[in-house]
Amino acid sequence: MTPARKAGNDPQEWLNRAKSNLVRAKEDIRLSGVFLEDLCFDAQQAAEKAIKAVLIRRNIQFPYVHDLMALLALIEKEGESLPEPVKQAGRLTRFAVVTRYPGLEEPVTREEYERAVIIAEAVVQWAGKQVKKSKRQKRR
C-alpha cells in the first residue's frame, strides 16, 4: 500500500521515500532482467533522501546534488559527529550517475551491490533516529 504523501519540506516524507528506494534496492534483486547498477542507484537514492531528511529536520539549507559526502559535510559543519557506517555513504555517490550509463564503468559486482545495500540501510536507520530525536527536542 502506498503511504500518504506529505509536503516536500516534511522530513518524514523524505524518509518515507528513502525507505521506498531501499525496499526496491533490496527486493528487486529477485526480478529477472534487473541490473545491479539500477539497484545500487536505488541504494544511493535511499541514502541521499535519508540524509536530506536530516538536513530538513535541522533546517540546514542544501543543494540538490547527489554527492553524499558534500551533504554529510553540512551536518558535520553543525557539530554532529557521524557514525562510521554513515560516513561510508560517500561510496554510494558513484552509483548516482556514472554506473547507470552503459559502458562508462565496469559492471557492478554482486559484492559491490551487497555493500551498497548495507551502507544504505545504515544511513536510513541513522536518519530515522535523527529525525525522531529532533522531533522530541523541538517539543521541549
Predicted regions and their residues:
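Terminal alpha-helical segments
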Residues: M1-R140
